[in-house]
């Protein structure tokens, strides 16, 4: 394989630029040419494709976001969109693609592979909700950003004796809420993987104020449960009488310079993706499991909620985020006593 392309798709995540940089520089070191595709699959279909060299990725490792831009392009789920994209790839002499993104991006990579066009996926999403890997690019940075924000909210919460509901991103996964909640010493963490009793949440707030000598209370809420405003309303209906405030950290979690960990795993996975394409392997997703590089069939990792995937050698990679998140939730309850 002499010429490959790289794209980012879906929601942006800190560390994507580090992955792009690794793909480009590793490919060049292997004697391959690299092209960048702007705006993900939309740019592929539009032919927004251009050469990338070492100069173009210089100083990008520390930058958040993605300099290749990103977009959601549901039209690529249709055969017409897929064939149009492949036509553009062939027009530019591209023989394989590295796709950086979440489960939607993986579905696009899977379709390319089904059409006989090798594609390798790299997990890039702050949600950490991709099967076949312990960590996704951007998750560590998002957690650190959330912790920094919650620490600051605690300052004002304690100054005024208030309860804060802090809503964080995560869609159907509570990883950001759990990790950030534990690291910031949150009093309660609410995630979609675990049922909660709103009356118990309210009574816990009251008990902390009246019997534990606390003058403030922090609740970290994953957006997949409900919005922070809706949760606060339910708390009031359940009898909470504390001075309640809601803060939605929102898209701030996607921004910022990536942490050292995100830069390292992005570089590691980007380099390995190139190695796979050089060997002519497609339809695979790169991941990190037990601090080791692994690859899994993209078909299994692209299925939302998949609890495991298989390597080419048939090795099972357990990916049971539900159990892990419940274990973390139990840990936080024991620490918030």
UniProtKB/Swiss-Prot annotation:
Activity regulation field: Allosterically activated by ADP and other diphosphonucleosides, and allosterically inhibited by phosphoenolpyruvate.
Gene Ontology CC: 6-phosphofructokinase complex
Superkingdom as given in the UniProt entry: Bacteria
Similarity field: Belongs to the phosphofructokinase type A (PFKA) family. ATP-dependent PFK group I subfamily. Prokaryotic clade 'B1' sub-subfamily.
Protein's name according to its UniProt entry: ATP-dependent 6-phosphofructokinase
Residues the entry annotates as binding substrate: 125-127, 162, 169-171, 223, 245, 251-254
Entry annotation: catalytic residues: 127
Originating organism: Streptococcus pyogenes serotype M5 (strain Manfredo)
Function: Catalyzes the phosphorylation of D-fructose 6-phosphate to fructose 1,6-bisphosphate by ATP, the first committing step of glycolysis.
Alphabetical keyword list: Allosteric enzyme, ATP-binding, Cytoplasm, Glycolysis, Kinase, Magnesium, Metal-binding, Nucleotide-binding, Transferase
Subcellular location field: Cytoplasm
Assembly mode: Homotetramer.
Residues reported to bind ATP: 11, 72-73, 102-105
Binding locations of ADP: 21-25, 154, 185-187, 212, 214-216
Gene that encodes the chain: pfkA
Enzyme class at the top of the EC tree: transferase
Entries under PANTHER family matching the protein: ATP-DEPENDENT 6-PHOSPHOFRUCTOKINASE, PHOSPHOFRUCTOKINASE
EC number(s) on file: 2.7.1.11
Cofactor: Mg(2+)
Catalytic activity annotation: beta-D-fructose 6-phosphate + ATP = beta-D-fructose 1,6-bisphosphate + ADP + H(+)
UniProt KW 4Fe-4S keyword: no
């Amino acid at each position: 394989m002499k010429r490959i392309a790289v794209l980012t798709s879906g929601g942006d995540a800190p560390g994507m630029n580090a992955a792009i940089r690794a793909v480009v520089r590793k490919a060049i070191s292997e004697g391959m040419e690299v092209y960048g595709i702007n705006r993900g699959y939309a740019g592929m279909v539009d032919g927004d494709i251009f050469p990338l060299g070492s100069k173009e990725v210089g100083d990008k490792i520390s930058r958040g976001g993605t300099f290749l831009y990103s977009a959601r392009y549901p039209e690529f789920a249709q055969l017409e969109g897929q064939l149009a994209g492949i036509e553009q790839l062939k027009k530019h002499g591209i023989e394989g693609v590295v796709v950086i993104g979440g489960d939607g991006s993986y579905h696009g990579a899977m379709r390319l592979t089904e059409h006989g066009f090798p594609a390798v996926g790299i997990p890039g999403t702050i949600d950490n909700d991709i099967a076949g890997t312990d960590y996704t690019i951007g998750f560590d940075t998002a957690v650190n950003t959330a912790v920094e924000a919650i620490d600051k909210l605690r300052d004002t919460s304690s100054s005024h004796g208030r309860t804060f509901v802090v809503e964080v991103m995560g869609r159907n996964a509570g990883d950001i809420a759990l990790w950030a909640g534990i690291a910031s010493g949150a009093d309660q963490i609410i995630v979609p993987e675990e049922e909660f009793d709103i009356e118990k949440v309210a009574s816990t707030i009251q008990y902390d104020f009246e019997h534990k000598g606390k003058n403030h209370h922090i609740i970290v809420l994953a957006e997949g449960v409900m919005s922070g405003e809706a949760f606060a309303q339910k708390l009031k209906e359940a009898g909470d009488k504390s001075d309640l405030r809601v803060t939605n950290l929102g898209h701030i979690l996607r921004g910022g310079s990536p942490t050292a960990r995100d830069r390292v795993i992005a570089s590691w996975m980007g380099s390995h993706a190139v190695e796979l394409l050089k060997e002519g392997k497609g339809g695979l997703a790169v991941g990190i499991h037990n601090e080791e590089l692994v690859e899994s069939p993209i078909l299994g990792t692209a299925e939302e909620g998949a609890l495991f995937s298989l390597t080419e050698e048939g090795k099972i990679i357990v990916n049971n985020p539900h159990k892990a998140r419940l274990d973390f939730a139990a840990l936080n309850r024991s620490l918030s006593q």
